[in-house]
Amino acid sequence: MPAMRPVRLIVGITGATGVIYGIRTLQVLRELSVESHLVITEMGKTTISMETDYAIGDVERLASKVYPVRDLAAQISSGSYPVDGMIVAPCSVRTLSAVANCSNDNLLTRAADVTLKERRRLVLMFREAPLHSGHCELMLDASRIGAILMPPVPVFYTRPQTIAELVDQTVGRVLDLWGLEMPGLKRWGV
């Protein structure tokens, strides 16, 4: 019987506000011993610096492997490299547009396109408001080709006391899509 490989997920962090979702996803994947492959756009790095106290190196060290956004020859740019899916957290309008239109001008969008063509799960935590019809059409187009749109909408039935609790609830729901159980995640009616 062949050896089982570890669960392997790609995490993309773009320049949209809400980079804490991507950072927390990496932290939880590490806690769950999930192999994570990270791509951060240049604007993602800028937003990390603006929104958090994390140094880029600290975020990168959370991942099992890190790739430069311009490295289109990276292993995750090929469907022959086995991964279980990809999470873009947060997902900018630019990235949503690239995914919806199959545009592969950087490693993050190439990896997303490969994820879809290989029929693997791609979650886009689209972070924009308010929306105009063009945004809605892009979301519909991305959904039609297989992406899962999961805007980081907070839930309040858990009676969150901190921003961290709001973030954890959303990250936990995303990881549910791979059958990964986030410790301490509050569920409806439980």
Regions found by a protein language model. Give the residues of each.
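A cross-family phosphate/adenosyl-ligand binding-site feature
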Residues: 1-123, 127-190
